[in-house]
A protein has these predicted regions:
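Membrane-interface amphipathic segments in extracytoplasmic regions
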Residues: 1-194
C-alpha cells in the first residue's frame, strides 16, 4: 500500500475486503500475520502505518462458519473445508462440539485467533492501530482523515445481520478458552457462561 504509506493486516471475516477496495487494491485477499510483512520488508514495515480490524470472537466465528458452509471463496481448500464441516456437523452448535478445537482453528485461517495476526510472541501488538469491526462506521472516518486514506468505506461481502445461535454453557466456555487472547487483548467481554 505504498500509495497511502500503510500496511493493512487483513484478518479474515473482519471487513477486510471493504478496506482493500477503499485502498484500491483488487489483487485478492492476502491473509498473513504482521510478522510476515516485517520479515519480507523490514524497512517499509517500520516506516508505514500498520493497522488491522478486529471483531468480537463469537461473531467472527459464526461468520466464518457460515462463509465456510457456502464454500468460502470457491477454492479447492475452501470446498474441502465446507465438506469437512458438513460431514461432521449439522448446525453451529454441533460444529462447536465436533470440530472446534485448537488443532482445527490453527489449521484454518478463517478460524485462527485474531491476536496471531497482529501480536508478537510476547503478545505485544505488532501494529500501530487496532480498529473494531463493531465501531468501524464511527472509527473509520477519523482514522482515514488522519492517515490520508479514502474517507468512505463501502461495506462489501456483508452478510445479513442474524441472531447468533444459542449455545450451551459448555460450548460458550470452549469458545472463551480457544479465543481467550482475542477477548483479553482487544477489549471484548468473554461470553457469559451462566
Amino acid at each position: 500500500m505504498h500509495k497511502y504509506k500503510c500496511i493493512f493486516i487483513h484478518i479474515p471475516k473482519n471487513a477486510g475486503s471493504s478496506v482493500m477496495k477503499a485502498l484500491g487494491d483488487s489483487g485478492g485477499r492476502f491473509h498473513v500475520e504482521s510478522g510476515y510483512y516485517n520479515e519480507v520488508n523490514d524497512y517499509f514495515y517500520k516506516k508505514y502505518h500498520r493497522f488491522a480490524i478486529v471483531r468480537h470472537p463469537l461473531e467472527r466465528l459464526f461468520s466464518a462458519y457460515k462463509y465456510s458452509l457456502q464454500g468460502g471463496n470457491g477454492s479447492q481448500s475452501d470446498k474441502l473445508l465446507a465438506d469437512k464441516i458438513k460431514s461432521n456437523s449439522h448446525d453451529f452448535a454441533s460444529f462447536v462440539d465436533a470440530l472446534l478445537d485448537m488443532h482445527f482453528i490453527m489449521q484454518h485461517k478463517l478460524f485462527k485467533p485474531q491476536y496471531l495476526f497482529v501480536c508478537k510472541s510476547d503478545l505485544a501488538l505488532n501494529i500501530d492501530t487496532v480498529l473494531h469491526f463493531e465501531k468501524l462506521a464511527d472509527q473509520w472516518p477519523a482514522f482515514a482523515k488522519k492517515h490520508n486514506l479514502p474517507h468512505s468505506l463501502e461495506f462489501i461481502n456483508r452478510s445479513e445481520k442474524v441472531s447468533l445461535p444459542i449455545l450451551t454453557s459448555a460450548q460458550y466456555k470452549k469458545i472463551n478458552q480457544l479465543y481467550y487472547f482475542d477477548f483479553e487483548l482487544f477489549g471484548y467481554t468473554p461470553i457469559d457462561v451462566n
